[in-house]
């Protein structure tokens, strides 16, 4: 039967394509734009001469190209990057132009206050910089000599609390359809029922008939598997009234379905077709992940009927050295590293992400809290979204929900973050209205927001929280509310047993990567809140300094306790820590950004990455810190720490044992009934989720040896000598010569024996042959050198270059530094699917 269905689907498709005359056509419009930074009168006019403007491709972010200056209007909120006003112009022809068709231009995101013209005619303005939107070009389009002009105004500062970027920083498309066509984002799929034998998929669709007369067309939906085989099909004849949008609903049964889950995120394609007889009128394809989501009051979150704890991180949208115009591979690599650390959930703080980000989450198996706004009626900055909320929030929220509702990775909507209207008279009504919008457009997901004042001295109003009582209450920093540090959500769950609970934002363990201060009894910054001993940060205002308060710091205690609580109580949906990755903005001079992530903005792992992996992952974890280069402190006592999920960890310093230690998890008494677990056979020396030893510092070697599932594992750190050489590695041996793909080349400064030099800050100069250098970074937010330069200092012994290619062939990256051996690596740019195995220099 399946073979017959597949042949039938293929036969019908081929027949229809043969008879087709009006199929949808989507053209990428990223290439060949002219750009000018600054305002020029009459730039929207067709006759304007833009020959002197810069030629570039979008996505493009002009802020990342500028200099970080203390007096830049956006200030520390956006990392002291420049903003301003810019113009883009593009000339294009439409060879297949047909006056009977409909044409639109789609922008995935322009930051911000963009106005668009076609051939001198103003199409409209869109203030919000994170929305995807489109304009109808049909009335003004011609076959040849079209001019598209876009004015982008990011000059009104401050309008963001984090780095926004400036410009057409996401993709652009030209869409050509027949006059009768599927509405934009007009097909919505969801899984109604699911078992091993069958999944029932519901498809809702909106069809626009812009003809002058009524029409009767066949509306067909097909489910196509990953091999291209049609596995389910349904169709019916629909009557379409002239100049109206018609809604339709159908269901399909998929037998023996492959489910979408975190381990095997299987994706089907839903192909939706409008036919006039055998002639295709329109076709759209959408991702289909067959999965069910539930939020039972006592079990938190169920994916396909199985309980899953959300091990989440908050992420801002910049991509480090590439700014806001992020090639897809940059996010793919970052998500690969997060996934390897046990992370399974992302909160898109605090705006809708790029569409391709969600495509990656679909393919890689992440759960996403898709967030809309950082402000509503009352603002946080003079020029932020509160100026536009009343007029624009319904359009912006609807755009997010309709655009993203076919992504199986998206499992809940968030309508706000730390909204000032938590206590205002208008807040409850605004929340209720937006929740209703979400439910009207998507009846499969619940809604939350990040509330940071639930138990504060000026608490969130009961009426505001009541708006979410049938959905999910999001808690920002629940561990900071004094008496609630221990009980967290328990008081509210007792008082409101029907409340669903998620930690939308909570304390993380950030700090500068591998930067420590002496004395050794003070911990590495990632264990506490950072280190005043990191000398550049001593220049920061007190608000932005990262203070080091001891290994058993409040941050470490909070994180460990919060995770125990989260795992012990089934009703807690999960925890989203702040943040997964360092980001530009929200900083004080001379810092460009926040170092709150457990990855820096190169994607390099901090110590805290290994802490979270030790509690989130089932893979053996054994991580030792700090580094072992403490010249001048020989014979003094310092602290050594270990993050692990192994048992019986033993520390050796230059061969001398400092004894075995073990963690105990969960701690006795954190379960709903006291000690309702088997504590295991080993003797726990601590109830914390990390281990420490006080040792005498002597140069040489520190080593930890541990046992995991009867397998012995170890980690060694050695005292490094003077920098003598460099090692170059690339994330993959090959990558595609397309704009969405890049290669990440990591440079490590080593001593003569190959040990990483943890204090090295050599200036590294890059030369690229066969490709283009897109950007350089090192993770040091106080390094104010341009990320578009061809050189970068190493920081904690490492730096990175991001490389692109315009054509297939070998790409060679050479790194040079004064006084040490040069490193070089060659890899391949190809038009084929890239290899996944990392490549290193010998």
Predicted regions span which residues?
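Non-catalytic, glycine-rich low-complexity segments
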Residues: 23-40, 52-95, 108, 112, ...
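Extended acidic/polar, glycine-enriched regions
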Residues: 142-143, 206-296, 693-699, 708-709, ...
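Active-site-adjacent substrate/metal-binding segments within catalytic domains
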Residues: 60-107, 111-119, 124-127, 175, ...
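Catalytic cores of secreted or luminal carbohydrate-active enzymes
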Residues: 161-183, 574-635, 639-725, 755-757
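Short flexible loop/turn segments that cap and initiate beta-strands
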Residues: 46-48, 214-220, 261-269, 645, ...
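Substrate-binding/catalytic cleft of secreted carbohydrate-active enzymes
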Residues: 278, 335-338, 344-608, 612, ...
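Accessory beta-strand-rich segments of carbohydrate-active enzymes
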Residues: 29, 37-39, 78, 83-185, ...
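Beta-strand-rich structural segments
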Residues: 203-207, 638-644, 705, 740-758, ...
